[in-house]
Structure formats: C-alpha cells, structure tokens
C-alpha cells in the first residue's frame, strides 16, 4: 500500500495563509474563570482531586491520572474552585470538569519545582507527572509513547505545521529552540534512542536555519527540510519522507523504528525539566478572515473559546459565520463558544458568514482529483461506492482505515462534494463492522 503512496500520492498545495508567522506569542488577558476538563487526552479521564471552595494555584494538581493510559491535570490559574461538575465534550460524551474563579494573582504553587531526573525510571515518572500529551492534536500520553515494546532507533520531531493559518509551532521553534533541544536530548539520553530527526517544511527557512545552528555541534540531531505539501505532518507520511520507511498496515510508528513527537510537545518537556511547571498553558493561533487582530496568544488551559476570540476581536462590519477549532483543513466547527480550550487546542479560526457559506454540491464528474491528491494514495470515489453498498470487504481492500481525514479530497473536488465527511463515515462504518465481525 505505501509503495503505491511513494509513487503516486502528491498531496494538496493549500494556500500559505500564515499571517501570524511573525506574531510573537503574547499572554491574553486573564479570564474571570476557567473550566478545566478531566479528559483532554486519549484514554481514561483524570479523577478530580479538588472540591468546591478549595484554593488552587498555577501548577496545582487538580486531576489524577485515571489509569496507565491517562494524564494528570493541573490548574492553569490561581483562585478558588467554584464547581466540580459534568460537562459535555465535543464528541457528545460527558466528563468531569473543574471550574475555577481566578483571583488575578497567578500565584505559582510552591510544589512546582524542577524534577530530579537521574535515570529512565525517574525521567518517565517526571513526564507522567507533568501531564504531557501530544500537543499537535492527538493527545496521546507522552510517557506511554516513550515506552514502546518495539526497538526504536529514531526520535522523529514533527515540526511540519502544514495546516492552513496555524503558526503556533513555528513560533515555538523561533522562541523556544533551547527548550526543544533540551527536551530532545533528555529523551535520547534516558530512553537510549540513538538519534533524532527534526522534520520542518521548507517554507519555514528561519526555523530550519535556527535549529541547524542550535544543533550544529550535536551529531545525534539532524534537521531535515521537507517539501511544503499539505499532509506532510501525518505520522505515516512524515516517517516515509524523513526515514524512507513504511509503517505496516495497522501498525504504529514504533513498528518502523520511530517515535514521533510534536515540536511543541518536546519543547514543553524541555521547559518542564528546567522549571517544573506542568502543562498549564499553550500558544494558540487566532486568525481567519473575520479576525480583527490575527495573532498568537498564550492561553491558560480551560479558557472559554469566546474569551480567546474576544482578545483578538471581530472585524468591524463583518458577520461571524463559523469558528473552527484547530486548522482550517482538519478542525471541527465549534458549536458552543463557551467550550474550554484544552492542552491540544492549537488554533481558533474565525470565518465570516460569506466564507462559511456551504458551497453548491454538484454530481461527481469522475475527474479523479481526489485520488490524485490524497496523501495516502486512497481512492475516495471507489470508497464512496463501497460504502454506499456497505461492502466491508471492498472497504478493506481500499484501505479506508488509512484515511486520517486531512480534507485534501474535499479541498480539490471541483464538484464541491463532502468527500472527507464521506471518508470519515466509511472508515467509522468499516472499523465498527470489523470490530463486531461483520460481512463474513
């Protein structure tokens, strides 16, 4: 399958709308309250450790990991717990949340101090304690990722940031390069992985130059410039482009000898090792054609979307039509502006009513562009037919489970068909049928 990918898949050339690429992150005004979710990661929710009326500080642990595949949660503000209550997640499920009224002081918890790391066990314990997850959007537990059963020879840092509008990773590279290197060196030292490759798209020459400079005397770390084609940041594509390896069907990056970390994740790890401050804030890109002041904001975890948007403002005379959480290609539309930011929130895109207007959908003209530009070499046209017939075996032959909903097929479709949504439905149907043994 991936041999075909190497020969045929091109990937879409999305607009290089990076108006905030030079926008150095600045702290947003402190909100009156935050709502911190106990589920911000893949795996079991954390268990709330606080109750109404408790005083908390920046860095106070307010949620204990609820299992091996779970993450600690820390307060992003100082103040008083106003409530511990259920909250509906964007996927429809319920989880506990901790509502904190801020006191405006941002007092740091006295317990926050740099961890003592002397060996692999203490390193992994420190990573787990700080609540670090994949900050590129996946939210997988970093300490679990760093304990693969397979033999791994490469730490691969995903610094491609190919999503339209997003520049928070770019700013992390430009402003926190020492933290990035510190995090990488710690991973290599304590896990025994011999080398690291940092993959950066070639439309970020300043980042490539800076990280080359920072690692010039570090032979274990290589900076690799990648083609600026949308989809490069997907793990399977990144591994193929950086290492020339294929991940087996249904496998993990570790099956190809690699561990992949987002560049902001490894930078956050570097900061934690130096300061002891857990994951309590992150840089969020706020942009879009309805945004008055596109910028990168440093946002406390748990801040309501509407508070972040108000900090950037809406253009005068422009009607806000839609807000997208994450990048314009893969991010979901926001239903509720009171929804809180999480560790994995990388951007909020403000679209005008005109830009958000759904296009006129026309019949498929069988042009094949969705096939030509799929970065995974899939065939959305054929998948659509197989899904319409509920043909599980054919969906398997078409490798629908390789789809990662990048949006390329919808982006290039001249008929404006919702190809990505169809692929998502087909994949969910296929995986559900396989799980229960359907179409035998």
Regions picked out by a protein language model, each given a short descriptive name:
Residues 174-189:
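Histidine-anchored nucleotide/phosphate-binding helix
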Residues 346-361, 371, 375-440:
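Ferredoxin-type iron-sulfur electron-transfer modules in oxidoreductases and energy-metabolism complexes
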Residues 134, 155-169, 290:
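Gly-rich Lys/Arg/Thr-decorated short loops/hinges at beta-loop-alpha junctions or inter-strand turns
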Residues 83, 88-145, 149-150, 205:
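Acidic low-complexity segments
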Residues 193-305, 311-316, 327:
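Hydrophobic alpha-helical positions that pack around
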Residues 1-49, 99:
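N-terminal, Lys/Arg-enriched amphipathic/low-complexity engagement segments
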Residues 51-64, 83:
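Short, well-structured beta-strand-loop connectors
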Residues 79-81:
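Conserved hydrophobic positions within beta-strands
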């Amino acid at each position: 399958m991936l041999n075909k990918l190497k020969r045929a898949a091109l990937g879409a050339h999305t607009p290089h709308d990076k108006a905030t690429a030079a926008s150095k992150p600045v702290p947003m005004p402190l909100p009156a309250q935050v709502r911190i979710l106990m589920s911000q990661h893949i795996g079991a929710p954390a268990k709330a450790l606080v109750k109404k009326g408790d005083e908390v500080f920046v860095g106070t642990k307010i949620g204990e990991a609820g299992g091996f595949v779970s993450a600690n949660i820390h307060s992003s503000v100082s103040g008083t717990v106003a409530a511990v209550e259920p909250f509906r997640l964007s996927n429809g499920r319920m989880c506990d949340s901790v509502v904190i009224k801020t006191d405006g002081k941002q007092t740091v918890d006295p317990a926050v101090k740099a961890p003592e790391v002397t060996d692999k066990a203490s390193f992994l314990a420190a990573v787990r304690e700080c609540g670090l997850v994949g900050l590129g959007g996946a939210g997988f537990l970093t300490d679990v990722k760093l304990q693969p059963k397979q033999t791994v020879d490469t730490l691969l840092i995903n610094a491609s940031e190919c999503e339209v509008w997003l520049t928070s990773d770019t700013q992390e590279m430009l402003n926190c390069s020492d933290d990035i290197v510190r995090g990488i060196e710690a991973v290599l030292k304590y896990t025994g992985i011999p080398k690291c490759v940092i993959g950066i798209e070639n439309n970020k020459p300043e980042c490539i130059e800076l990280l080359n400079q920072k690692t010039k005397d570090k032979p274990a770390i290589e900076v690799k410039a990648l083609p600026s084609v949308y989809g490069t940041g997907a793990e399977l594509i990144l591994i193929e482009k950086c290492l020339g390896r294929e991940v087996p069907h249904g496998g993990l990056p570790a099956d190809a000898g690699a561990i992949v970390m987002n560049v902001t994740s490894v930078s956050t790890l570097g900061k934690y090792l130096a300061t002891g401050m857990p994951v309590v804030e992150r840089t969020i890109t706020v942009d879009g054609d309805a945004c008055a002041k596109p910028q990168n904001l440093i946002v406390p975890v748990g801040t309501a979307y509407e508070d972040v948007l108000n900090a950037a403002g809406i253009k005068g005379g422009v009607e806000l039509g839609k807000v997208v959480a994450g990048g314009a290609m893969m991010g979901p539309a926001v239903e509720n502006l009171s929804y809180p930011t999480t560790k994995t929130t990388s951007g909020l895109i403000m679209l005008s009513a005109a830009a958000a207007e759904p296009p006129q959908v026309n019949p498929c003209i069988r042009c094949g562009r969705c096939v030509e530009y799929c970065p995974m070499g899939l065939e959305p046209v054929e998948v659509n037919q197989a899904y319409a017939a509920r043909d599980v075996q054919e969906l398997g032959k078409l490798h629908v489970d390789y789809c990662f909903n990048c949006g390329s097929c919808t982006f290039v479709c001249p008929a404006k068909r919702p190809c990505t949504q169809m692929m998502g439905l087909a994949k969910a149907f296929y995986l559900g049928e396989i799980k229960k043994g359907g179409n035998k």
